[in-house]
């Protein structure tokens, strides 16, 4: 099957190629026949001549070239004809062909004459003997023959006939045309030639004739026109040139001239205006900010300065009022010493629960300064008495590095009950045992 298809395709290809070659040959022979008819037929020759005439008629330059070549050819033919006639060597066949050529040339010449453009005469300029018909008939016979050819044609007809014969020939060509007609004829001949061109035209006619010749030439052009006419003539020559331009105009005229130059710039602006003017200058700067505001105003001013600072805070407040009390509170109670010893031991035990010192508070504030907020901080200790701090709500917008220890920070005491180290060890052990047992059981 494949062999049959191959044979069929090859045979089809050969058949188509044979037809194509035959078509090519037929086309070539047909074109050759048409060209032969155009070249050798009389009608084709006439058509060629007409095309040639039309072509050269449109192209004038080529037409002239063709005409010249034909003229040369005609002259050559005439010379040859004369020579042949004189020699008697021309035959009838040649004469007949030459007669036909002459007819063709005559016909071509007539056509060429029709296509030739007529020549136009050029305009000629009038000679010296023909005067200008538009010339001025009233020319001045005495006119200056040396008139400036570049003179102004629009000269002023109203020029001054009595011009100054001694006028400055080098006058300023840029002079002011609107000069003052009432100018001073007796002007100062020694006037300053470099006067200020921008001088004030409305100068003060009553100006001071005794002006200081050493006045400052660089005076402030923006000086205050409303300056105080009653200014102090004896002003301080050493006044501060950097004085505050926004100084308080309502300042106290009776201010203390000996005020403290090192006063606290961060002083409380809301200080008590009714404060005691005779306050103790040596008061404790670290006083307890949480002191009882309702302290007894009748307290003993001569209290014992050596009192026990570690007294039992849980002591019975009514013990001294039970002069004839019952039980262990009786004045002659034999167990009284036992109770006092127990109280002393309790006082020793409570040493771990005493309130934190100011130093401890300051250290804690430095430690948590970046985390300070209006919320209470964690307790400063994990066992015993500590402190909690926060920023007062009114000072929440202040930068943390500008917070005042006394006025911007609020403090309170906190207590941590679980202080036994044994308890911590037991808790840790129980937790470890629970973790290990959980791991092993699983």
UniProtKB/Swiss-Prot annotation:
Composition bias type Polar residues, residue spans: 319-334
Domain TSP type-1 as annotated: residue spans: 367-420
Disordered: region residues: 69-357
Leader sequence segment: 1-18
Entries under Gene3D superfamilies matching the protein: Thrombospondin type-1 (TSP1) repeat
Bilayer topology annotation: Lipid-anchor; GPI-anchor
Post-translational modification: During host cell invasion, proteolytically cleaved at the cell membrane in the region I by a papain-like cysteine protease of parasite origin. Cleavage is triggered by the sporozoite contact with highly sulfated heparan sulfate proteoglycans (HSPGs) present on the host hepatocyte cell surface. Cleavage exposes the TSP type-1 (TSR) domain and is required for productive invasion of host hepatocytes but not for adhesion to the host cell membrane. Cleavage is dispensable for sporozoite development in the oocyst, motility and for traversal of host and vector cells.
Region of interest: Required for the binding to heparan sulfate proteoglycans (HSPGs) on the surface of host hepatocytes: 114-121
Domains as described in the record: The N-terminus is involved in the initial binding to heparan sulfate proteoglycans (HSPGs) on the surface of host hepatocytes. The N-terminus masks the TSP type-1 (TSR) domain which maintains the sporozoites in a migratory state, enabling them to complete their journey to the salivary gland in the mosquito vector and then to the host liver. The unmasking of the TSP type-1 (TSR) domain when the sporozoite interacts with the host hepatocyte also protects sporozoites from host antibodies.
Similarity annotation: Belongs to the plasmodium circumsporozoite protein family.
Protein's recorded name: Circumsporozoite protein
Organism of origin: Plasmodium falciparum (isolate Wellcome)
Gene that encodes the chain: CSP
């Amino acid at each position: 099957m494949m062999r049959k298809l191959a044979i069929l395709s090859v045979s089809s290809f050969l058949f188509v190629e044979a037809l194509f070659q035959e078509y090519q040959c037929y086309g070539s022979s047909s074109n050759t026949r048409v060209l032969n008819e155009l070249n050798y037929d009389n009608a084709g020759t006439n058509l060629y001549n007409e095309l040639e005439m039309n072509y050269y008629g449109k192209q004038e330059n080529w037409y002239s070239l063709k005409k010249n070549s034909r003229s040369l050819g005609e002259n050559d033919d005439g010379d040859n004809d004369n020579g042949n006639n004189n020699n008697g060597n021309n035959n009838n066949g040649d004469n007949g062909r030459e007669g036909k050529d002459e007819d063709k040339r005559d016909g071509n010449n007539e056509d060429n004459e029709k296509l030739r453009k007529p020549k136009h005469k050029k305009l000629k300029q009038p000679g010296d003997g023909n005067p200008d018909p538009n010339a001025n008939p009233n020319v001045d016979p005495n006119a200056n023959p040396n008139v400036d050819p570049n003179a102004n044609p629009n000269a002023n007809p109203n020029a001054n006939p009595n011009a100054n014969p001694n006028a400055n020939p080098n006058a300023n060509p840029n002079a002011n045309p609107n000069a003052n007609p009432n100018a001073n004829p007796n002007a100062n001949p020694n006037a300053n030639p470099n006067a200020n061109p921008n001088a004030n035209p409305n100068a003060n006619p009553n100006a001071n004739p005794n002006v200081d010749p050493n006045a400052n030439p660089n005076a402030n052009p923006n000086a205050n026109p409303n300056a105080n006419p009653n200014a102090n003539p004896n002003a301080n020559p050493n006044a501060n040139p950097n004085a505050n331009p926004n100084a308080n105009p309502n300042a106290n005229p009776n201010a203390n001239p000996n005020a403290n130059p090192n006063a606290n710039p961060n002083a409380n602006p809301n200080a008590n205006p009714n404060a005691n003017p005779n306050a103790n200058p040596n008061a404790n700067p670290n006083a307890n900010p949480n002191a009882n505001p309702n302290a007894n105003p009748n307290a003993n001013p001569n209290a014992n300065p050596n009192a026990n600072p570690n007294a039992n805070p849980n002591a019975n407040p009514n013990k001294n009022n039970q002069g004839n009390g019952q039980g262990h509170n009786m004045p002659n109670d034999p167990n009284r010493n036992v109770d006092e010893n127990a109280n002393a031991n309790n006082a020793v035990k409570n040493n771990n629960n005493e309130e934190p010192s100011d130093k401890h508070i300051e250290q804690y504030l430095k430690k948590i300064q970046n985390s300070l907020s209006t919320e209470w901080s964690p307790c400063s200790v994990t066992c015993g008495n500590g402190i909690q701090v926060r920023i007062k709500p009114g000072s929440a917008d202040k930068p943390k590095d500008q917070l005042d220890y006394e006025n911007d920070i609020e403090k309170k005491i906190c207590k941590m009950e679980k202080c036994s180290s044994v308890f911590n060890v037991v808790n840790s052990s129980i937790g470890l045992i629970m973790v290990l047992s959980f791991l092993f059981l699983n």
